[in-house]
Amino acid sequence: SGEAVISYKTARTIQQHLDDSLFKTYWIDITPDGWFYVSKDNSKFPVDRNDFSILIDGIQQKFDAVFIALHGTPGEDGKLQGYFDMVGLPYTSCNALTSAITFNKRVATAVAGAAGIPVARSVLFLRGELTNWEEKVSHLTFPVFVKPNNGGSSIGMSKVEKRGESLRIALEKAFKEDSQVLVEEMIVGREFTVGVF
């Protein structure tokens, strides 16, 4: 994902803090080129995606569980969780459906709003729909946040203080990260993040 640097940092931190006397860890790298176990000497061994196993020196290695450290897609959007559900491997994170809902900001906001939680007014843009963009946000109060609808770590996000050209520039920036962009009114208040598992 576009969040690879953050993912690698997370994975290193997890690996450093797991007790080696209790757990044998394997670094699995998921890239556009494939899925690989990367050994300490940087040798790469392909992952058999039929059962999420690796072959090292002719010996098949299967795993007891997966510690997901991959930010963005496919690590936070339900795709990886769904895969591990299919192969029957337990993993650390919420399930596939919950991941998919929370990764899509528009859907997560709709679910929260339906539950009676106050949410910011927003407009969703799809790639190629930038005609009349000023009109589409005319009912919003500025400042607004412009962000990729699917993604995290604030990549591609901008705060836009007033209407005009800066909004168009922020939309273009966000569209570099996703095919859907959310323009959302700013809510003044304190922000809390609570991890629930």
Language model features with spans:
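Short, hinge-like loop/turn segments at secondary-structure boundaries
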Residues: 42-46, 110-113, 138-140, 163
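ATP-grasp fold ATP-binding core
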Residues: 112-113, 137-157, 178-192
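Phosphate-binding site of ATP-dependent enzymes
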Residues: 162-197
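ATP-binding N-terminal substructure of ATP-dependent carboxylate-amine bond-forming enzymes
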Residues: 1-97, 101-103, 107, 126-135
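Anion (oxyanion) recognition and catalysis
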Residues: 19, 85, 113, 138, ...
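Short acidic-hydrophobic, aromatic-tinged amphipathic segments that line or gate anion-handling sites
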Residues: 123-127, 158-163
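Short, glycine-/small-residue-rich phosphate/pyrophosphate-handling segment
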Residues: 103-123
